[in-house]
Each structure stands twice: as C-alpha cells, then as structure tokens.
Amino acid sequence: MKQSRPLRENRKHGDLLFPVSAYETKMEEDFQMPLSYHWHPEIEIFFITSGKANFQVEAEQFVIEEGDVLLIKPNTLHGSHDCFGTKLEFRAVVFDFSVLSWMANVRIELKYLQPLLAQEQGRYILLREKNSIQKALFEMLNKTFFVFDEKEKGYELLVRAYLLQV
C-alpha cells in the first residue's frame, strides 16, 4: 500500500524504542460516535469487552460483538459507523511488527509470523468461536492491556511475551 493513500491515521503508536500502544474506549447507550475509518502501518488487535458494532475492514462489513477478537493487518483500512445505539466497550492493542520479530527465532518468524500477516491470506482475522482457546486468547489480550496500562518496571518484556503468545 502506498504511503499517499488517504485516511492514514496520524497518531503515533508508542515510540521508536517500543512501538506499542493500548487503548480502551467506552461508549454509553445511544451515543453514536463513529470509529473513524483509517489505516496505519501497525498491526491492531481489537477486542470487544461489551456490546456490539457494525465494523468494516476495507470493503467488507460485519458485526462484531462481546468476546470477538479482530486482528487487523498492517496498512488495512478499517473503522465503524454504527454501534446499534447500545453500550459498547472495546480495547485495542496497536503495535509494529518489529515488536514480535525483534530477536525472534528466524524459523518462528518465517514459519508463523510472516504467513500470519501475508496480505494474500486476507486483510484481517476474526475470531468468534467461543471455545477454550478463544477464551484464553481473550484473557491474554486483557493481561496485555493491563500490563501496558500499569507500566511497571519491565512491562515491555511482558507485553512482548503476551503478544507472542497471542
């Protein structure tokens, strides 16, 4: 994707040494704030903790709801305009691929990480199935969010470890 593509998000996610950010958004009932359509060069893991919303990734629209986990690949246009007038709470972790690949085993990067993010495999991954693996993934994302939010000494190591586990 070319850098000149419109709707690029201007927000900086993390910093040069640790390009990771975590966000939490809570919307009350009947509050229809759109999640502006945008793209960024980072990976985004978006997970719904309460409610549901119409979501769009590139030209594809679908409903995401409590418990769903959406991995949005780099340089992918995404956003929402309809939260059904219901309470909606979600968290997002946005990070550069280098957080996963830095000092990672080359075999792991080539065999698992690069194919996961390959655009020919689709622009996103949506996990809806409510089984034990998905539940553990959701818990791991919440741990990632809380560790990032607290920012205690060494938090970067835990955030990276949790993201690799996801």
Predicted features along the sequence, with ranges:
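A hydrophobic/aromatic-rich effector-binding and dimerization subdomain
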Residues: K2-S21, L77-F145
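Residues at helix-coil transition
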Residues: S50, F146-D149
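All-alpha amphipathic helical-bundle segments outside canonical DNA-binding/catalytic cores
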Residues: E129-S132, F148-Q165
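A generic structural signal for short coil/turn motifs at secondary-structure boundaries
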Residues: V57, L100-M103, E152-K153
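Generic protein-terminus/edge-of-domain signal
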Residues: M1-V69, T76, L110-K111, Q121-I125
